[in-house]
Regions:
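Alpha-helical and coiled-coil interaction segments, frequently adjacent to or embedded
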Residues: 168-170
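Acidic/histidine-rich, surface-exposed loop or edge segments in extracytoplasmic proteins
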Residues: 181
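Solvent-exposed beta-strand motifs enriched in subsets of small alpha/beta binding domains
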Residues: 215-221
Length: 221
């Protein structure tokens, strides 16, 4: 939950940039004048369902230009499907209730495949003779294979087991290297930008007690 907290709040300046637009107007405009009218028509109906269910009043339906709501920036359909009434007041209120917002974010991450207790990002050391074509999120191998290729954990040992991971190099071969585990996919599903997802995942590891990652040393080791 601590990792999710930063992912949620850091995405929008800790809730400072949630938007100030009436999402009914935003979604109605996008449903009429957009390259994805079917998508936004469904989101407009999702916004109506939120009000019908009693979660928010029409004047509280404030978000960004794309119709995303509150500090979590959920689409209305996500809000309706994954919203959680964590504070027990009888309605899902991600606008005013921090417990509801955080629990809903965790619920959405779970839908993206998040597995509690499993790793998401681990700093590693990569040998110079590494088959670099195997790096990238599109390539997944068991940790045992990464170990055979000479990849080692930056701290501790890298188990030679069957847990799949991808090698990502955010700053290229000469920068820090990481194994991204299946839980990292949940960050990518939330925001497909690798820089954003890696940063959020990194701060998540820091909140979980991990030391700072290295900055690279100018050459593979």
């Amino acid at each position: 939950m601590r990792a999710l907290t930063l992912l949620l709040l850091g995405a929008l300046g800790f809730g400072a940039n949630s938007g100030n637009m009436n999402i009914f107007r935003s979604l109605a405009t996008l449903a009429y004048d957009c390259r994805r009218p079917d998508f936004f028509r469904e989101e407009l109906m999702g916004a109506v369902r939120i009000v019908e269910r009693g979660d928010l009043k029409p004047h509280e339906m404030i978000g960004n230009w794309a119709g995303e709501l509150g500090p979590t920036q959920f689409t209305p359909s996500q809000y309706f499907k994954y919203g959680v009434d964590f504070d027990g007041d009888g309605r899902v209120d991600m606008i005013h209730s921090t417990p509801d917002a955080l629990a809903s974010a965790a619920n959405l991450m779970k839908s993206f495949g998040w597995q509690r207790g499993q790793p998401w990002l681990q700093e590693v050391r990569v040998p110079a003779e590494m088959p670099w074509q195997e790096s990238g999120l599109e390539n997944k191998h068991p940790r045992s294979q990464w170990v055979r290729w000479g990849v080692t954990a930056a701290r501790g040992q890298l188990p030679a087991d069957n847990l799949e991971a991808s090698l990502i190099l955010p700053m290229g071969r000469l920068g820090p290297a990481f194994l991204a585990y299946p839980n990292f996919k949940a960050y990518i599903e939330w925001n497909a930008a690798l820089v954003y997802s890696t940063t959020a995942a990194y701060f998540g590891t820091r909140l979980a007690g991990a030391p700072p990652f290295g900055q690279g040393n100018g050459q593979p080791v």
